[in-house]
């Protein structure tokens, strides 16, 4: 016959009874803020303390915190033990500073006796105000009056932002179907907002405003900067075309002037003056040219050898003219006569060259 339990054993059983009834004796289920799985929205840089609770059971379990799979150190931890083989319950607290890169917080409980483990999880939804990563526009000619403008803005926000395009006349009404949304799995919180407009007048500036529950962000889009790609290319083409046209005109004018000069030279013909050909000794020589009368000047660098013609080539008419124009006392019909003895050299047909003394030099030729 079994004896009734003593006072000490009865007191021990009464202490374990609430834990055994709530957990089902051996079923260890941790909870974070009273829930096994939950989602919590936090603002960026917000601090929040999470508490993990576990009911009593046999043995003494171990509690640990994991943030995105990384083991964390608990802020406070307390387990209530009842005897050596059971505990009545425990709590553990962990404080999180929210960042947008954080996603999940886990409280893990492990039973050392059975090796079983249980987890409680909280999904972190970190919210932040919109960030405009990039904004731009592309212009093209429209079929009607004005310009066809494609505006785009890359906005990063959580929760997703409402984007409004504003010009100098106020907000631009845009159909949401014109928005192109990128794949959120590959680009978290990044949305491409694109809208196509037709401007009938050039706005001073364009701006985009992104708003959500956390905050508001705006960015301006100056019109002169946007129209640079549309204006610079035609202007450059005009400058290049003007330069080419000017160069062509100058070249054509030069060619016409050269042709006119050549035509005039051919029309006038050769010069009436005798041509002088320069010799190797830099002296001018007469080439088959009849010398002028004796009272005309000769070139200063002319030598006597250049003016001595062949006596056989002298015509009788020229000889008679020279005798009529010469003084009788200076005639020298025979070589080596009076003129030769007086220092004169007779040049038949062509006249005489006189050599006299000079004050500035030894002699001068006339």
Curated annotation (Swiss-Prot):
Cellular localization per UniProt: Late endosome; Lysosome
Compositional bias (Polar residues): 299-308
Residues covered by the Ig-like domain: 30-123
Signal peptide limits: 1-26
Tissues where this protein is expressed: Expressed throughout the brain with higher levels in the pyramidal cell layer of the hippocampal CA1 and CA3 regions. Also highly expressed within the hippocampal dentate gyrus region and cerebellum and in scattered neurons in the cerebral cortex.
Sugar-modified residues: 106, 162, 175, 192, 205
Topology, Extracellular side: 27-232
Region (Disordered): 299-335
InterPro entries: CD80_C2-set (IPR013162), Ig-like_dom (IPR007110), Ig-like_dom_sf (IPR036179), Ig-like_fold (IPR013783), TMEM25 (IPR042864)
Keyword terms of this UniProt record: Cell membrane, Disulfide bond, Endosome, Glycoprotein, Immunoglobulin domain, Lysosome, Membrane, Secreted, Signal, Transmembrane, Transmembrane helix
Residue intervals annotated with topology Cytoplasmic: 254-366
Transmembrane portions of the chain: 233-253
Gene Ontology BP annotations: negative regulation of excitatory postsynaptic potential; regulation of protein stability
GO cellular component: extracellular region; late endosome; lysosome; plasma membrane
Cystine bridges: 52-107
Assembly information from the UniProt record: Interacts with GRIN2B.
Function: In neurons, modulates the degradation of NMDA receptor GRIN2B subunit. Plays a role in the regulation of neuronal excitability.
Protein name: Transmembrane protein 25
Organism name: Homo sapiens (Human)
UniProt lineage: Eukaryota, Metazoa, Chordata, Craniata, Vertebrata
């Amino acid at each position: 016959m079994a004896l009734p339990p003593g006072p000490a054993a009865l007191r021990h059983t009464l202490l374990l009874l609430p834990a055994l009834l709530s957990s089902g004796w051996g079923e260890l289920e941790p909870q974070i803020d009273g829930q096994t799985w939950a989602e919590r929205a936090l603002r960026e840089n917000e601090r929040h303390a999470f508490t993990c609770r576990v009911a009593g059971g046999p043995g003494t379990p171990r509690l640990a915190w994991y943030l995105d799979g990384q083991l964390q150190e608990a802020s406070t931890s307390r387990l209530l033990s009842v005897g050596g083989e059971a505990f009545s319950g425990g709590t553990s607290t962990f404080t999180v500073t929210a960042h947008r890169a954080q996603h999940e917080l886990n409280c893990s409980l492990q039973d050392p006796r059975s090796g079983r483990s249980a987890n409680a999880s909280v999904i972190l939804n970190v919210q932040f105000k919109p960030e405009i990563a990039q904004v731009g526009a592309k212009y093209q000619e429209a079929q009607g009056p004005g310009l066809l403008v494609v505006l785009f803005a890359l906005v990063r926000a959580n929760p997703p932002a409402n984007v409004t395009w504003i010009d100098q006349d106020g907000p631009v009404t845009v159909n949401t179907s014109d928005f192109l949304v990128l794949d959120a799995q590959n680009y978290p919180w990044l949305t491409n907002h694109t809208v196509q407009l037709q401007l009938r007048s050039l706005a001073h500036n364009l701006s985009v405003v992104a708003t959500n529950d956390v905050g508001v962000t705006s960015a301006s889009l100056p019109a002169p900067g946007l129209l640079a790609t549309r204006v610079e290319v035609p202007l450059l083409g005009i400058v290049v075309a003007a330069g080419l046209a000017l160069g062509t005109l100058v070249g054509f004018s030069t060619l016409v002037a050269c042709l006119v000069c050549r035509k005039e030279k051919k029309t006038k013909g050769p010069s009436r003056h005798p041509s002088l050909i320069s010799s190797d000794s830099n002296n001018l020589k007469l080439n088959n040219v009849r010398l002028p009368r004796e009272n005309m000047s000769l070139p200063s660098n002319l030598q006597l050898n250049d003016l001595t013609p062949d006596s056989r080539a002298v015509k009788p008419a020229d000889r008679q003219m020279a005798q009529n124009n010469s003084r009788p006392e200076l005639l020298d019909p025979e070589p080596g006569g009076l003129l030769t003895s007086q220092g004169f050299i007779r040049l038949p047909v062509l006249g005489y060259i006189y050599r006299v003394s000079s004050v500035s030099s030894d002699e001068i030729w006339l």
